[in-house]
Protein backbone atom coordinates (compact mmCIF):
# COMPACT_ATOMS: atom_id res chain seq x y z
CA UNK A 1 0.00 0.00 0.00
CA UNK A 2 1.11 3.57 -0.71
CA UNK A 3 0.67 6.21 1.94
CA UNK A 4 1.46 9.76 2.98
CA UNK A 5 1.72 11.17 6.50
CA UNK A 6 0.84 14.67 7.64
CA UNK A 7 1.93 15.28 11.23
CA UNK A 8 1.66 18.30 13.50
CA UNK A 9 4.87 19.65 15.01
CA UNK A 10 3.79 19.31 18.64
CA UNK A 11 6.15 17.41 20.98
CA UNK A 12 3.55 14.75 21.75
CA UNK A 13 3.17 13.92 18.05
CA UNK A 14 6.78 12.87 17.39
CA UNK A 15 6.75 9.53 19.30
CA UNK A 16 3.42 8.62 17.72
CA UNK A 17 4.83 9.46 14.28
CA UNK A 18 7.82 7.18 14.85
CA UNK A 19 5.53 4.41 16.05
CA UNK A 20 3.32 4.74 12.96
CA UNK A 21 6.29 4.59 10.60
CA UNK A 22 7.44 1.39 12.29
CA UNK A 23 3.99 -0.17 11.95
CA UNK A 24 3.87 0.78 8.24
CA UNK A 25 7.34 -0.58 7.44
CA UNK A 26 5.96 -2.92 4.75
CA UNK A 27 4.07 -0.07 3.04
CA UNK A 28 5.51 2.51 0.66
CA UNK A 29 5.73 6.20 1.59
CA UNK A 30 5.08 8.39 -1.48
CA UNK A 31 4.38 12.04 -2.26
CA UNK A 32 1.71 11.39 -4.91
CA UNK A 33 -0.67 8.60 -5.83
CA UNK A 34 -1.17 7.48 -2.24
CA UNK A 35 -4.03 5.24 -1.16
CA UNK A 36 -3.98 6.20 2.52
CA UNK A 37 -3.42 9.55 4.19
CA UNK A 38 -2.51 9.52 7.88
CA UNK A 39 -3.14 12.76 9.78
CA UNK A 40 -1.46 13.00 13.19
CA UNK A 41 -2.56 15.82 15.48
CA UNK A 42 -5.61 17.36 17.06
CA UNK A 43 -8.84 18.40 15.40
CA UNK A 44 -7.45 21.80 14.36
CA UNK A 45 -4.56 20.23 12.48
CA UNK A 46 -6.91 17.69 10.91
CA UNK A 47 -9.17 20.45 9.59
CA UNK A 48 -6.31 22.48 8.07
CA UNK A 49 -4.85 19.37 6.43
CA UNK A 50 -8.13 18.31 4.91
CA UNK A 51 -8.59 21.74 3.35
CA UNK A 52 -5.35 21.35 1.41
CA UNK A 53 -5.36 17.64 0.60
CA UNK A 54 -8.86 16.55 -0.34
CA UNK A 55 -7.54 13.78 -2.61
CA UNK A 56 -9.67 11.62 -4.92
CA UNK A 57 -10.83 8.38 -3.26
CA UNK A 58 -7.87 8.18 -0.88
CA UNK A 59 -8.62 6.93 2.63
CA UNK A 60 -8.01 9.44 5.41
CA UNK A 61 -7.05 8.10 8.83
CA UNK A 62 -6.94 10.47 11.79
CA UNK A 63 -4.67 9.63 14.73
CA UNK A 64 -5.24 11.89 17.71
CA UNK A 65 -2.26 13.46 19.47
CA UNK A 66 -4.17 16.51 20.71
CA UNK A 67 -6.83 17.13 23.34
CA UNK A 68 -10.03 16.73 21.30
CA UNK A 69 -10.47 13.98 18.74
CA UNK A 70 -13.84 14.22 17.05
CA UNK A 71 -12.24 13.69 13.63
CA UNK A 72 -9.85 10.92 14.63
CA UNK A 73 -10.46 7.21 15.08
CA UNK A 74 -7.18 6.19 16.71
CA UNK A 75 -4.52 7.27 19.17
CA UNK A 76 -0.94 6.19 19.78
CA UNK A 77 -1.98 3.15 21.84
CA UNK A 78 -3.74 1.67 18.79
CA UNK A 79 -0.52 1.45 16.77
CA UNK A 80 0.32 -2.18 17.48
CA UNK A 81 0.95 -5.31 15.39
CA UNK A 82 -2.78 -5.58 14.63
CA UNK A 83 -3.19 -2.02 13.38
CA UNK A 84 -2.84 -2.74 9.66
CA UNK A 85 -5.24 -5.68 9.70
CA UNK A 86 -7.81 -3.61 11.58
CA UNK A 87 -7.29 -0.67 9.25
CA UNK A 88 -7.79 -2.63 6.04
CA UNK A 89 -10.98 -4.21 7.40
CA UNK A 90 -12.65 -0.89 8.20
CA UNK A 91 -15.30 0.71 6.03
CA UNK A 92 -14.39 4.15 4.68
CA UNK A 93 -17.05 6.59 3.52
CA UNK A 94 -17.23 9.99 1.90
CA UNK A 95 -18.64 12.72 4.11
CA UNK A 96 -20.56 15.92 3.47
CA UNK A 97 -18.55 19.13 3.41
CA UNK A 98 -19.84 22.66 2.96
CA UNK A 99 -18.96 24.02 -0.47
CA UNK A 100 -18.48 27.79 -0.38
CA UNK A 101 -18.59 29.78 -3.62
CA UNK A 102 -17.73 33.41 -4.22
CA UNK A 103 -17.39 35.28 -7.50
CA UNK A 104 -13.84 34.07 -8.08
CA UNK A 105 -13.31 31.16 -5.71
CA UNK A 106 -14.75 27.84 -4.58
CA UNK A 107 -13.55 25.88 -1.56
CA UNK A 108 -14.64 23.33 1.02
CA UNK A 109 -15.33 23.77 4.72
CA UNK A 110 -15.32 21.03 7.36
CA UNK A 111 -16.18 23.12 10.44
CA UNK A 112 -17.67 26.49 9.54
CA UNK A 113 -17.53 29.69 7.60
CA UNK A 114 -17.56 32.59 10.05
CA UNK A 115 -18.57 36.16 9.23
CA UNK A 116 -17.52 38.88 11.68
CA UNK A 117 -18.44 42.55 11.68
CA UNK A 118 -17.74 45.21 14.31
CA UNK A 119 -20.25 47.62 12.78
CA UNK A 120 -23.36 45.39 12.73
CA UNK A 121 -23.11 45.52 8.94
CA UNK A 122 -26.27 44.22 7.21
CA UNK A 123 -26.15 40.73 5.68
CA UNK A 124 -29.12 39.48 3.68
CA UNK A 125 -29.70 35.73 4.02
CA UNK A 126 -31.46 33.73 1.30
CA UNK A 127 -32.61 30.11 1.62
CA UNK A 128 -33.30 28.37 -1.70
CA UNK A 129 -33.55 31.83 -3.31
CA UNK A 130 -36.15 32.95 -0.75
CA UNK A 131 -35.22 35.93 1.40
CA UNK A 132 -34.96 34.76 5.00
CA UNK A 133 -33.86 37.82 6.95
CA UNK A 134 -31.67 40.90 6.93
CA UNK A 135 -29.25 40.23 9.76
CA UNK A 136 -27.30 42.83 11.75
CA UNK A 137 -25.04 41.96 14.65
CA UNK A 138 -21.56 40.66 15.47
CA UNK A 139 -21.55 37.97 12.82
CA UNK A 140 -22.81 34.66 11.48
CA UNK A 141 -21.67 31.05 11.43
CA UNK A 142 -22.68 28.49 8.82
CA UNK A 143 -21.41 24.94 8.72
CA UNK A 144 -22.09 21.24 8.15
CA UNK A 145 -22.80 18.63 10.81
CA UNK A 146 -19.10 18.00 11.40
CA UNK A 147 -18.64 21.55 12.67
CA UNK A 148 -21.34 21.34 15.32
CA UNK A 149 -18.85 20.43 18.07
CA UNK A 150 -16.44 23.22 17.11
CA UNK A 151 -17.05 26.99 17.10
CA UNK A 152 -20.77 26.40 16.55
CA UNK A 153 -21.09 24.77 19.96
CA UNK A 154 -19.34 27.71 21.65
CA UNK A 155 -21.90 29.96 19.96
CA UNK A 156 -24.78 27.96 21.49
CA UNK A 157 -25.53 26.07 18.30
CA UNK A 158 -27.00 22.58 18.19
CA UNK A 159 -24.76 19.53 18.60
CA UNK A 160 -25.68 17.33 15.65
CA UNK A 161 -25.21 13.57 15.80
CA UNK A 162 -23.67 11.43 13.03
CA UNK A 163 -25.85 10.39 10.08
CA UNK A 164 -27.78 13.68 10.27
CA UNK A 165 -26.48 15.63 7.28
CA UNK A 166 -27.68 19.21 7.60
CA UNK A 167 -26.54 22.82 7.34
CA UNK A 168 -26.65 25.01 10.46
CA UNK A 169 -26.78 28.82 10.58
CA UNK A 170 -26.09 30.62 13.87
CA UNK A 171 -26.47 34.32 14.65
CA UNK A 172 -23.79 35.93 16.82
CA UNK A 173 -25.13 38.64 19.13
CA UNK A 174 -27.87 39.95 16.83
CA UNK A 175 -28.74 43.63 17.04
CA UNK A 176 -32.29 43.95 18.31
CA UNK A 177 -34.65 46.91 18.47
CA UNK A 178 -38.35 47.39 17.62
CA UNK A 179 -37.65 47.63 13.89
CA UNK A 180 -34.91 44.98 13.76
CA UNK A 181 -35.77 41.55 15.16
CA UNK A 182 -34.28 38.34 13.75
CA UNK A 183 -34.90 34.67 14.56
CA UNK A 184 -32.16 34.57 17.29
CA UNK A 185 -32.06 30.76 17.20
CA UNK A 186 -29.89 28.27 15.31
CA UNK A 187 -31.45 27.25 12.01
CA UNK A 188 -31.11 23.62 10.85
CA UNK A 189 -31.62 23.09 7.11
CA UNK A 190 -31.87 19.92 4.99
CA UNK A 191 -28.75 18.82 3.15
CA UNK A 192 -30.09 19.80 -0.29
CA UNK A 193 -30.66 23.41 0.77
CA UNK A 194 -28.82 26.24 -0.94
CA UNK A 195 -27.96 29.21 1.28
CA UNK A 196 -26.72 32.59 0.11
CA UNK A 197 -25.33 35.62 1.94
CA UNK A 198 -25.54 38.94 0.09
CA UNK A 199 -23.55 41.94 1.31
CA UNK A 200 -23.49 45.42 -0.22
CA UNK A 201 -20.29 47.39 -0.70
CA UNK A 202 -19.49 49.41 2.43
CA UNK A 203 -19.01 53.18 2.40
CA UNK A 204 -15.68 52.60 4.15
CA UNK A 205 -13.60 49.46 3.53
CA UNK A 206 -13.01 48.89 7.25
CA UNK A 207 -16.78 48.52 7.74
CA UNK A 208 -16.97 45.52 5.40
CA UNK A 209 -17.29 42.16 7.20
CA UNK A 210 -14.40 39.72 7.59
CA UNK A 211 -14.79 36.12 6.46
CA UNK A 212 -13.00 33.03 7.84
CA UNK A 213 -13.18 29.51 6.40
CA UNK A 214 -12.20 26.98 9.10
CA UNK A 215 -10.21 29.74 10.79
CA UNK A 216 -8.41 30.97 7.65
CA UNK A 217 -9.20 34.56 6.65
CA UNK A 218 -10.54 35.00 3.12
CA UNK A 219 -9.34 37.81 0.91
CA UNK A 220 -12.64 39.36 -0.15
CA UNK A 221 -12.76 42.88 -1.51
CA UNK A 222 -15.11 45.61 -0.34
CA UNK A 223 -17.71 45.28 -3.09
CA UNK A 224 -21.20 43.92 -3.65
CA UNK A 225 -20.66 40.30 -2.64
CA UNK A 226 -22.63 37.08 -2.92
CA UNK A 227 -21.50 33.92 -1.12
CA UNK A 228 -23.38 30.67 -1.68
CA UNK A 229 -23.29 27.50 0.41
CA UNK A 230 -24.34 23.91 -0.24
CA UNK A 231 -23.37 20.47 1.05
CA UNK A 232 -21.29 18.30 -1.30
CA UNK A 233 -19.64 14.90 -0.89
CA UNK A 234 -15.93 14.88 -0.14
CA UNK A 235 -13.54 13.37 -2.66
CA UNK A 236 -11.62 11.63 0.12
CA UNK A 237 -13.03 8.78 2.21
CA UNK A 238 -12.95 8.74 5.99
CA UNK A 239 -13.15 6.26 8.80
CA UNK A 240 -14.91 7.65 11.81
CA UNK A 241 -17.37 5.82 13.97
CA UNK A 242 -20.98 6.74 13.26
CA UNK A 243 -22.26 4.83 16.28
CA UNK A 244 -24.34 6.83 18.72
CA UNK A 245 -22.52 5.40 21.74
CA UNK A 246 -19.08 6.36 20.41
CA UNK A 247 -20.23 9.92 19.72
CA UNK A 248 -21.84 10.21 23.15
CA UNK A 249 -18.64 8.96 24.80
CA UNK A 250 -16.61 11.65 22.99
CA UNK A 251 -19.11 14.35 23.93
CA UNK A 252 -19.11 13.30 27.57
CA UNK A 253 -15.33 13.09 27.85
CA UNK A 254 -14.90 16.49 26.17
CA UNK A 255 -17.76 18.66 27.37
CA UNK A 256 -19.72 17.09 30.23
CA UNK A 257 -18.37 17.09 33.79
CA UNK A 258 -20.57 15.75 36.58
CA UNK A 259 -19.87 14.51 40.10
UniProtKB/Swiss-Prot annotation:
Active site feature? 43
Where's it found, cell-wise? Cytoplasm
EC main group: transferase
Which molecular-function annotations from GO does this UniProt entry contain?
A: ATP binding; metal ion binding; NAD binding; NAD+ kinase activity
- List GO BP terms, alphabetically: NAD metabolic process; NADP biosynthetic process
What does the record give as EC number?
2.7.1.23
**Might you report a single GO cellular component term?**
cytoplasm
Where is it predominantly found?
cytoplasm
Ligand binding (NAD(+)):
43-44, 111-112, 136
Under HAMAP family, the record lists:
NAD_kinase
Q: What does this protein do?
A: Involved in the regulation of the intracellular balance of NAD and NADP, and is a key enzyme in the biosynthesis of NADP. Catalyzes specifically the phosphorylation on 2'-hydroxyl of the adenosine moiety of NAD to yield NADP.
- Name the chain's protein: NAD kinase
Give the source species: Mycoplasma genitalium (strain ATCC 33530 / DSM 19775 / NCTC 10195 / G37) (Mycoplasmoides genitalium)
